[in-house]
Amino acid sequence: MKFELLADSIKQINEKASSAAKSAVNQLMTLRNWAIGYYIVEYEQDGSDRAEYGSHLLKNLEKKIDYKGLNETLFKVCRQFYKVYPQIGSTVSSKFKLPDLGKSSTVSNEFVTNPDVLVNNLSFSHIREIMVLNDAFERFFYETECMKCNWNVRELRRQIKTNLYVRA
């Protein structure tokens, strides 16, 4: 083996490993964010001591957890994520070996991206851009186009802003 080949081989394996690690971390953080949303919504609906925390629940949660990045803003986003994408529950349950978290609300399966495909192909930053769209078919359209065209978040944001969905 020549030195150049050795160096190229090591560089290549390092790049592949780094890429796989980034992808795995992103997938786990996406699933974590969904689970956080699930637990917050479940608590808001059924928590026996919820009256004690009331409208300050997320702020109190941030203070109690006291961990960088887990803050009121993220908790709001996670709650919305859970409500918009309830179908991800099965993926979260299997990945974290939790009891079946199932679907909380009714979502038409007609325009729903497979949760495993969604989590494996879109970053949470992509999902965050898409989940603010009110129309399920529009979300499905951007999820599909984003995966098909391999858009980065900036390009996705641009396509949403220029109403590609309406123009297509």
Tell what function each PLM region has.
Residues M1-A168:
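Basic, low-complexity intrinsically disordered segments
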